[in-house]
Amino acid sequence: MSSSTQPRLVIYHQTLHQPNNGPPVSLLPLITNNTCVTHVIVAAIHVNEGPGNITLNDDPPDAEKHATLWGEMVWVQASGVKVMALLGGAAKGSFERLDGDDIARFESYYAPLRDLLRQHRFDGLDLDIEEPTSLPGTVRLIDRLRADFGPDFLITLAPVATALLPNQPHLSGPAFDYRLLEQMRGHEIAWYNTQFYCGWGDASTTAWYDAIMSVGWRADKVVMGLITNPANGAGHVEGSRMESVIRMLRAKYPNFGGVMGWEYFNALPGGTERPWEWAANMGRALRAPVPTPPAQQQQVPIRPYGMGAVPAQLPPAQHHFPAESVKTLQYLGFSQHQAVAALNSTGGNVEYAAGLLFQD
């Protein structure tokens, strides 16, 4: 990590208002309560049909409802916390419009995005690619961001955990290889906000992180992504257990990349009343003295990307799919990891999931 030897503490901020059109969710407690948060990622920017048709979630960025957000961003940044924007996410279309060989089309969609990032002085952009996308299109976007914003602008990606392992389904399309992207543009990518939840991984032990390290990833570039509240998705890990996992990862990997949380507004244990408590607890675990690891916990030798299969001992990822759907795919000869990942990719459709697995 170029700017600090300390692990990152990243929090996503998508639900910008309390439920039922309530008041804005304030970011200021993250800095007034000494949480040690290092990065806030505002989500989600969508590049919609028609050049210049950009929304922050469902509304124009300059909508009155966002005034508090833009005002608080300045205070958060003044405290030393970097504030980034998330592009894409579950709502598809942003990357499709920025992809393809038509340069004029790319420019027409990219320029308004660039102007928005400049207007609000974001410190970086997180690319959450949850739709089929090409590597050349992503490389072009990364190169253009670097050219327009300079060397200090943070460029991150948000893959699911399976995307960093060989031969596993993920959300960015069968032709998209994050390991190849890292080889091509790793020098421009600050880190990966890796999703260890919603059936794509497991954060209750170090096993999935260890597996990613074993196929050649650098620990300083892999941030372990966590669900902050079970209402936000499957795979939530209770606080004290998560803190124990973090301590083990820091002992195993002195350059551990840190943790991120999805998302801020209802993070436990404080919930909607005190959501900053999650960050404060994670911050203590990330800043506490590092225990000395036993010899058998030292990192295995790094192998070239793609060598070896996913370790068979990986704990199953938590998910919400019917057991019968998973078993159907297992009967066809696929592992539980593959079955859950394919169901995630196809919205739970067993037939489409089987087709995806056989295609791979």
Question: Where are the predicted features?
Answer:
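Chitinase-like catalytic core of GlcNAc-active glycosidases
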Residues: 2-243, 253-256, 265-282, 289
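Surface-exposed patches in mature extracellular/periplasmic domains of secreted proteins
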Residues: 129, 258-261, 341-342
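Short basic/hydrophobic patches in alpha-helices and adjacent helix-turn junctions
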Residues: 214, 244-252, 328-332, 345
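C-terminal accessory extensions appended to soluble enzyme cores
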Residues: 243-247, 257-260, 270-311
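Short, amphipathic alpha-helical interaction segments embedded in low-complexity terminal/linker regions
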Residues: 290-360
